[in-house]
Amino acid sequence: MKPLLALVGRPNVGKSTLFNRILRQRSAIVDPTPGVTRDRHIAEGEWQGKQFKLMDTGGYNTDGDVLSKAMLEQTLHALADADSILFITDARAGLSYEDLELARILQRSFQHKQLFFVVNKVESPQLVIEAESFIKTGFTTPYFVSAKDGSGVADLLDDVLEALPEAPEGEVKGDTAVHLAIVGRPNVGKSSFVNALLGTNRHIVSNIPGTTRDAIDSRLMRNQQEYLLIDTAGLRKRTKIDAGIEYYSSLRSERAIERCEVAIVMLDAEQGIEKQDLKIINMAIERKKGVLLLVNKWDLIEKDSKTSIRYEEQLRMAMGNLSYVPVLFVSAMTKKNLYRALDTALQISRNRSQNVSTSQLNKFLEQTLAQVHPATKSGRELKIKYMTQLKSAWPVFGFFCNDPLLVQSNFRKFLENKLREAYNFEGVPISLRFLHKNKVKED
């Protein structure tokens, strides 16, 4: 298993900038607003041939508001998972009460871990002199760095990774987990859903829209199958996204969909489906991901024996031609249908990766063409010789014909519907490609 390094410190000391410097990419959200990294964010890195995971925690502070207390709890929870802890302070801002308090917590509760004291933003000789006073924290060997220009970071990484024990050979294997992205508008219950599955308050849960700003990965094992759950910031309409934090969070959610096999799109039962929900669903469909629609907070709805039927009918009308997307009614609060949702997502993942033999497909084609013959176009008749499944991450079927330009949209839709009737592609977009002389016409 790759060692986990955690960055911790009060808000705005430069943890996310250092995170990005170490990974050499813009991964964590960076903004001068204190507390931008509210929850933990983990990414993989490599230095001098050594692989590791780096975790950017929420900023530590002693404010009394509900969200700050939740951030503190999450920070301590995150540190318990780490192999090494990098305690970050700010040379320009000077030592604060929060710095001293956090130093005491680290020395008292995490003395069994590798602790590294980092003074960031040391970008002049004068700041080096002033930073000497930081030994008041009790850490006598500070590392003076500048995450902004990179000075001192290499020496820090050398020492941090040198102090870690060597990972046993062959322990790092290919990821066989099913990748699920939990996406939706803010405050529909995505983090509550993940926490209920994990059985732990692993993500900050608050009724403040947009509490989970970054995409966060968690792993879950069920019935000998591992799942990677990617909990994301809620996707807002672009007009509601501020130039800084919300913009980057929305991009992160879109990237989470690109990483997943199945997008679990969550709705609020009381709010119903909106244009932004349809946009999220279509975003996943366009990227050829599996899709599962969850209606959360179902426990809050007054209902009779036909409520769910009527509700689903309204959803189907709004979704139009996405009849293959399954709908489940769940409650993260009461845990209604949570594991059924997970099992359904697994089945969708399997549907997405299934392969149908060429012999089966051509038998299917023969039977289908016997039912309905393609209409002529400009006096010419479409003739399909055979079909096969093409190699792809999602189901793609190639139809070899005399002229792809003769294929009409209604016949294409007919073939797709027949394929769905014959094989289980629930929750999965499928592509039909009509081929002639190595030229491809895609749907």
Swiss-Prot record:
Keywords: GTP-binding, Nucleotide-binding, Repeat, Ribosome biogenesis. It holds the Pfam family MMR_HSR1. One of its GO terms (biological process) is ribosome biogenesis. Disulfide bonds: none annotated. It comes from the Bacteria. GTP 2 binds at residues 184-191, 231-235, 296-299. One of its GO terms (molecular function) is ribosome binding. InterPro entries: AAA+_ATPase (IPR003593), G_ENGA (IPR031166), GTP-bd (IPR006073), GTPase_Der (IPR016484), KH_dom-like (IPR032859), KH_dom-like_a/b (IPR015946), P-loop_NTPase (IPR027417), Small_GTP-bd (IPR005225). GTP 1 binds at residues 9-16, 56-60, 120-123. The keyword Repeat applies. GTPase that plays an essential role in the late steps of ribosome biogenesis. Belongs to the TRAFAC class TrmE-Era-EngA-EngB-Septin-like GTPase superfamily. EngA (Der) GTPase family. Associates with the 50S ribosomal subunit. NCBIfam families: GTPase_EngA (TIGR03594), small_GTP (TIGR00231). This is GTPase Der.
